[in-house]
Amino acid sequence: MHRTTRIKITELNPHLMCVLCGGYFIDATTIVECLHSFCKMCIVRYLETSKYCPICDVQVHKTKPLLNIRSDKTLQDIVYKLVPGLFKNEMKRRRDFYAEHPVDATNGSNEDRGEVSDEDKRIIADDEIISLSIEFFDQKKLDGKDGEEKESTKEVTVKRYLQCPAAMTVMHLRKFLRSKMDIPCTFQIEVMYEDEPLKDYYTLMDIAYIYTWRRNGPLPLKYRVRPGCKKIKLSSPRNDMSGGRRPDTESDSSSDKPNSPSIVAAPSTSSSMPSPNTPVQSTHPSFPHISTINGVSAKVGHNGQTPFSSKVCKTSHNGSNSLG
């Protein structure tokens, strides 16, 4: 299973920090001309005395530079999600500020005042408690005609409700289900969102971000139990009927020993080799004077003798050669 690549937040800091104040983006604002981003308060104060970008010196606007900057909500959400505790601390700072200055609180939105309801929260902290529901995944409900779910009145699926930290992984949830339901290790447990299996390294925070959970109810999860995969041993291929050499993929017990030579079965020649009194038949019916000796085509002379150049050379044990 391929895991996601984890990198340190310090490696992303150049893309998440404002060059004017040296901190993480708060109310990220981007210049339209060059797409460089800064904190809203930082870039507004800077453009009061300059009409050029602080990074690349591109002219923002000739007379009114504030017309060419835009609020970047996407970038701000990324910063809040990547930096732990930043959103929570920023909302607390805003509430404390507007508590001391109640007159200014009427002009801003709820997020500007730091008063964000649970339904409007887009950021989830690591230590936050998430409510979730988990139930058995019934495949039969999805097998209805024309993709419609079957309404089963006989069987009612029981939901279980849990409160878990946002940093808890799917693997921990699987172990919890296995221990509570006494599921043997020979069976596999899959945790799912709707009909899609979830990775073991997903946290509840990841699931909420990926599937855009809006906090309008418990995080709906499902599970199913499957029998474990059995390891099947592949049988090695048999030797051919001709008694040829065994294939390399077959394990040979004699080859595993360092001092035992590998034995190769030689083909039987009792039925295939002709006897000395049997005349050699030609493999060329159109040319009966051509025959084959030891696989080599040889010509026979007028007197029925094989020429000297076509005779077979035999080697004896003492190294002396003789002609057949």
UniProtKB/Swiss-Prot annotation:
Nuclear localization signal, short sequence motif: residues: 81-95
Biased composition (Low complexity): 256-279
Positions annotated as zinc finger (RING-type): 18-57
Disordered: annotated segments: 232-324
An annotated Gene Ontology molecular function: zinc ion binding
Function: Component of a Polycomb group (PcG) multiprotein PRC1-like complex, a complex class required to maintain the transcriptionally repressive state of many genes, including Hox genes, throughout development. PcG PRC1 complex acts via chromatin remodeling and modification of histones; it mediates monoubiquitination of histone H2A 'Lys-119', rendering chromatin heritably changed in its expressibility. In the PRC1 complex, it is required to stimulate the E3 ubiquitin-protein ligase activity of rnf2.
Name this protein carries in UniProt: Polycomb complex protein BMI-1-B
